Amino acid sequence: MSLTQPKSPAPAGIFRAALLAVGCLLAVSCKAAEAPEPASGADLGCGPQVCAEGAALRDAYAGPVEAWPAVETTNDTPFEEMALLDRPLAAEATPMARLGEALFFDPILSASGQIACASCHHPDLAFTDGIRSSVGHDRQQGRRNAPTLLDKADQPVFMWDGAAMSLEHQAMMPISNPIEMAETQAALIETLNTDPDYAKRFQQVTGEDTVAMADVTAALAAYERTLTRRTKFDLFLEGDRDRFTDQELFGLHLYRTKARCMTCHSGSRLTDDEFHNIGLTYYGRKYEDFGRYALTEEPDAVGEFKTPSLRHVRRTGPYMHNGLFPSLRGIVNLYNAGGARPRPRPGMENDPLFPETSELLPKLNLTSDERDALVAYLETL
């Protein structure tokens, strides 16, 4: 069947029944979000020195966060201290969120009737899709990696380039994107208004006789604000200090000190919500992506991308805006080297748009064991 085949009313009942069956299975996955994610494991590859370093830090990290060893950032960059997230109510708590959950898993939002929000943001994959870049309408492949939707309730800006300023705005963009769901707002609203089930549910929630696009995005955003999962890191912050292995504890210490991770990844969501160039523009080459420059047209924005949250990072690979990094160890190696530092090729020496890697990325000189410890800690997040 072609992905562009028009929606047919004939098999709608059969398709909706199948969808409900899938929804029941997905509901089990969503319920799992209420429990902590599985532990990351034991001290794999933890050498005697690293384990000893971690054991020696037990007392230093036994007290409240404000009593932990001082944070070190590049150029004394301001940061927010680590903290627990404000947990949102479950989707079952509000009718709007329940309606948004139904829409999220329903391919009725797409032109082909075959692509749902969950196609690229699956609960079993930490609300990502686990591939380099997502595949959308008519098997088209996008340029960017699908970010997780977990813990987005308080996020101020969305998309790798900051194109969306709210969850509602973010929810609308994939629907109308010709590469993703390829549906027009007019066609979608007509479909929902003529669907007896959705027409009734929207009327019950909004009190209006007709569905508007703002109602659709409000429902999706309401559901997405409920998406969260507790992790091993949360349990540690809550006071279970024995939850971390010695290697993970040493990794936490490195994250806050020698590795300078808190320069950009701090606060309860472990991000500064800013835009930085870490050297992955691929200027003039395959995978070229100008990042935020496409929105601002400011030369300094070439190659800048939003700092992603590191929460749930163990389960959200492959990594970076283009999904070209399959492992956390590769990411740590990149930052250990001070980021990528591409040089202009002949003819590009005076190009005003040639991107410059951020000065916030010094070489770190982490040993192999230290990098292993840092990865072990990242896997607790």
Q: Could you describe each region identified by the protein language model?
A:
Residues 2-5, 30-381:
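Periplasmic c-type cytochrome electron-transfer domains
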Residues 7-9, 18, 33:
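Residue-level detector of intrinsically disordered/flexible regions characterized by low predicted structural confidence
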Residues 16-27:
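Bacterial N-terminal signal peptides
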Residues 1-13:
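N-terminal secretory signal peptides that target proteins for export/translocation
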